[in-house]
Amino acid sequence: LQNNTIDSSLNPQWYLYDNGNYISHIKNNSNKLQTKNISSSGSQHEFIVSLGGSLNEKIYLGATIGFPTLNYYELSVYTEDVLEDTINNLEGFSLEEELSTNGDGINIKGGAIIRISENFKIGASLHSPTYFNIEESYTSAINTYFSSNNYTEISPSNYFKYELITPWKGVFSASAIFNKYILLSADLEIVDYSFTKLNSASYDFRYENEAIQNSYQKTNNFRIGSEINFDEIKIRAGYSKYGSPYTNNDFYQEGYSLGIGLNKNNYFLDIAY
């Protein structure tokens, strides 16, 4: 909200300038201890309403309406302590910045699974963008510490409302069973990160949206997994490859997994890595 700048109303509390000739409040070459602490917390939840059905046990259809919520809080404190005596007994400064973000949104997901045969299925799903309405508040304060007194100046609270539209996602999947003992499944996920957009009635996000479109791209993510069933013991393995969301970047991320499961007399034990 502040473009990483300090509200001009806070400047007098720094005591770093004078309306006449410059007078330093700190000795030249004095030692200073600079520290910065950032504490943050947040969460995201989603309430969903789903509906599903089948046609002749061959085609399975499903749809979901999601209502996600998010919240985020951050407190940043920058402190500068003067470790030596100063001209005016100045001991230090601190800058406190507080950011609070809350939002709610809506999205739709739909999909279908087709059973080609008893042992082979294919499926597809489409996840719409999530349309978030977000509210943010930002405040800052400057504290100046002298040996004889302290001074504090608090900036006016800044409030901002905007819309965030997240990328859409499509998933294609297939699974097959071989000889009743081997299960093989694969997913192809397509995500267009360049679709992300910001909108606001009080601010023109044209340049930010252009930067998003120029910096991000559509990416393909691939996952494959297998399970071998030895009656009471099951062996599992998986592999994933995620493409880079950034343009002009060939980076990709790979993942591997192994697992074993035990099922005996209604007791289950699963170990995975």
Stretch-by-stretch model annotation:
Residues 1-273:
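Outer-membrane beta-barrel porins/channels
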